[in-house]
């Protein structure tokens, strides 16, 4: 019997397996798919020689995450000249750059980033700390810099940047929470960029798998479970809460995030954007509240993704059809359709992208099991994006669940030693 069984070999499950193996535990990872990685996979999805990411594609949270630094995982990030562009048909373009002077957030933005640096450590600690984290949360709420950041009043282009970044989530972008998400992703983009991974996002998974196997972790693929496995110390469920509910027979109260339509393309050349900044930004935002499209173009940042002079790209939307997405791109880049060599369309059902809504009803202590990884089942921990700190490739949920399992085992061991000592006296 293994010390721990991790159900699910997405990045959170692999992070958890690595953390436990580092402490000398024997670990088995069981994955229903025929390959590990979950959302963090890539391949020649459309035609040979062109690499597209299966789901996640750009990684500001990964670049910022203390988890990957703690594990010593060196990810080969690649950046474009700019971070992102959000063009409008009126001829203006909002720009996010790692150079604050190029970012169109207005003249106060450098000062804003100075204030951001004062609160960023507390935010990053939140990625690896379970809630309720009352003291840290109160300290952050009372931090003057945090309050001033939320009162930021950018100009029109800056507001467009915040809006587009907020729309990476399913939160109303002009709400307080939406504004906070928009500011967070804008600031992380300023600090860390929106890098892609050289050769494809699957490289992250390969690095985590190699590290785990070097520490004796057993990885079994293509095994779908109908009941919880047994382990000496802990079972970590790196799966969504609805799959956990299916296995355990318990109901889940978490609300799903919206369905998503994702398109991938192989192209005969770079996208002919009418916006000059969009020609230099791997991430492009199109539209607004009701018709938002998130678009990615890889090869300007990572030439290994396609043959010379060619391009691979992707887009997703929560509200538009495939034809509407392509029509929207064509308006901003006339001639785009003529460059398309091949396309792949995937409809992702509700809950598939972030494993739960990012709205208030599923934040912090309102997340499943009051924001902590314990599930109410003995020694079973939730280690997926359904748990705090939620979606994004940062490894926080896997890290938190693994630390909880280690602490619980240590307490049980201490109680056992205490009982043994008492019985001998």
Give the label of every model feature segment:
Residues 2-118:
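N-terminal glycine-rich phosphate/pyrophosphate-binding loop and immediately adjacent elements
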Residues 88, 221-307, 422-424:
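Mid-domain catalytic core of redox enzymes
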Residues 89-177:
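Rossmann-like flavin
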Residues 158-172, 334-388:
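A glycine-rich dinucleotide-binding beta-alpha-beta segment and adjacent secondary-structure elements
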Residues 183-225:
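Helical element adjacent to the flavin cofactor pocket in flavoenzyme catalytic cores
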Residues 298-360:
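FAD-dependent oxidoreductase catalytic-site/capping-region signature
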Residues 383-409:
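A conserved FAD-binding loop/helix module that cradles the flavin
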Residues 407-425:
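Active-site-proximal substrate-binding core of FAD-dependent oxidoreductases
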């Amino acid at each position: 019997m293994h010390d721990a069984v991790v159900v699910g070999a997405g990045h959170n499950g692999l992070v958890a397996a690595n953390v436990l193996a580092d402490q000398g535990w024997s670990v088995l990872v069981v994955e229903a798919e025929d390959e590990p990685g979950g959302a963090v996979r890539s391949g020649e999805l459309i035609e040979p020689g062109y690499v597209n990411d299966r789901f996640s594609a750009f990684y500001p949270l990964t670049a910022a995450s203390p988890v990957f630094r703690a594990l010593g995982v060196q990810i080969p990030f690649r950046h474009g000249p700019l971070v992102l562009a959000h063009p409008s048909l009126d001829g203006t373009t909002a720009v996010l750059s790692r150079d604050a002077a190029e970012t169109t957030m207005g003249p106060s933005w450098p000062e804003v980033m100075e204030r951001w640096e004062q609160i960023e450590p507390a935010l990053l600690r939140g990625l690896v700390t379970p809630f309720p984290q009352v003291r840290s949360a109160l300290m952050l709420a009372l931090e003057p810099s945090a309050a001033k950041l939320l009162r930021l009043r950018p100009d029109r282009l800056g507001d467009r940047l915040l809006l587009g970044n907020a729309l990476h989530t399913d939160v109303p972008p002009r709400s307080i929470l939406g504004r906070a998400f928009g500011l967070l992703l804008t600031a992380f983009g300023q600090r860390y960029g929106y890098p892609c991974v050289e050769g494809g996002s699957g490289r992250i998974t390969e690095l985590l798998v190699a590290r785990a196997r070097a520490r004796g972790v057993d990885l079994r693929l293509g095994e779908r479970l109908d009941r919880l496995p047994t382990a000496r110390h802990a079972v970590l469920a790196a799966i969504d809460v609805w799959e956990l509910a299916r296995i355990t027979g318990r109901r889940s109260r978490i609300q799903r995030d919206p369905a998503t339509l994702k398109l991938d393309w192989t192209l005969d050349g770079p996208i002919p954007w009418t916006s000059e900044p969009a020609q230099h930004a791997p991430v492009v935002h199109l539209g607004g509240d009701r018709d938002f499209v998130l678009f990615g173009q890889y090869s300007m940042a990572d030439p290994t993704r396609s043959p010379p002079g060619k391009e691979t790209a992707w887009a997703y939307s929560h509200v538009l059809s495939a034809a509407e997405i392509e029509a929207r791109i064509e308006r901003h880049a006339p001639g785009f359709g003529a460059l398309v060599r091949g396309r792949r369309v995937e409809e992702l059902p509700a809950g598939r992208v972030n494993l739960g809504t990012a709205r208030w009803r599923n934040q912090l202590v309102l997340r499943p099991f009051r924001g902590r990884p314990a599930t109410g089942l003995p020694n079973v921990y939730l280690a997926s994006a359904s748990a705090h700190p939620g979606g994004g490739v940062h490894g926080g949920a896997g890290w938190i669940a693994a630390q909880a399992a280690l602490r619980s085992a240590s307490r049980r061991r201490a109680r056992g030693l205490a009982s043994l000592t008492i019985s001998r006296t």
